[in-house]
Amino acid sequence: MFEYVTGYVEYVGPEYVVIDHNGIGYQIFTPNPYVFQRSKQEIRVYTYHYVREDIMALYGFKTREERLLFTKLLGVSGIGPKGALAILASGQTGQVVQAIEHEDEKFLVKFPGVGKKTARQMILDLKGKLADVVPDAFVDLFSDTERFDEKKGTSAELDEALEALRALGYAEREVSRVVPELLKESLTTDQYIKKALSLLLNGKR
């Protein structure tokens, strides 16, 4: 089991990043790959090594707490790695925990791949068991007020963001519905993803 991988970001795509560590490139699937930027600065990614008969993959996270919630979600029947990543990519960690504790199925079914049965299973399996997942400990990667001083998004960034949404499991009709709102903004890829997920989870679907 790998605890974490340190290295340099060599590639960022809709589903994963590639971290170069001593000449070896690690393909790591993450909730929102675009929070990572290619640079000469070494980073640390906390990892989860997922092994099944037909698949072996590394999943990566900014914090141990984020990884902990991912592993707890994997323990719920009906939720696989892709579904767990989609939930984490929303940036609504606190709301997810609150929804589980308050048995708010209507909020949980907003995530791709989560129907009423799975939402109910999440509540049954996780309610009262998330005390060690502290939302305040999460790095706030999804703040609507986050802005870079100089870098602004272009149409290329928007295209990348839409591909990332599709990779998370959102249907084309859902993606299309948020495009008009996104076209009003000039953001980075990461910021477009955050904005789109905020719109999707707040009813514009």
Curated annotation (Swiss-Prot):
Presence of keyword DNA-binding: yes
Region called Domain I, residue ranges: 1-62
Gene3D superfamilies: 5' to 3' exonuclease, C-terminal subdomain, DNA helicase RuvA subunit, C-terminal domain, Nucleic acid-binding proteins
Annotated region described as Domain II, given as residue ranges: 63-141
GO biological process, one term: DNA recombination
Disulfide partners: none
Main location: cytoplasm
Domain of life: Bacteria
GO cellular component terms attached to this protein's record: cytoplasm; Holliday junction helicase complex; Holliday junction resolvase complex
GO molecular function terms listed in the Swiss-Prot or TrEMBL record: ATP binding; four-way junction DNA binding; four-way junction helicase activity
Assembly and interaction partners: Homotetramer. Forms an RuvA(8)-RuvB(12)-Holliday junction (HJ) complex. HJ DNA is sandwiched between 2 RuvA tetramers; dsDNA enters through RuvA and exits via RuvB. An RuvB hexamer assembles on each DNA strand where it exits the tetramer. Each RuvB hexamer is contacted by two RuvA subunits (via domain III) on 2 adjacent RuvB subunits; this complex drives branch migration. In the full resolvosome a probable DNA-RuvA(4)-RuvB(12)-RuvC(2) complex forms which resolves the HJ.
Role description: The RuvA-RuvB-RuvC complex processes Holliday junction (HJ) DNA during genetic recombination and DNA repair, while the RuvA-RuvB complex plays an important role in the rescue of blocked DNA replication forks via replication fork reversal (RFR). RuvA specifically binds to HJ cruciform DNA, conferring on it an open structure. The RuvB hexamer acts as an ATP-dependent pump, pulling dsDNA into and through the RuvAB complex. HJ branch migration allows RuvC to scan DNA until it finds its consensus sequence, where it cleaves and resolves the cruciform DNA.
Domain comment in the entry: Has three domains with a flexible linker between the domains II and III and assumes an 'L' shape. Domain III is highly mobile and contacts RuvB.
The protein's name: Holliday junction branch migration complex subunit RuvA
Native source organism of the sequence: Bacillus cereus (strain G9842)
Upper classification of the organism: Bacteria, Bacillati, Bacillota, Bacilli, Bacillales
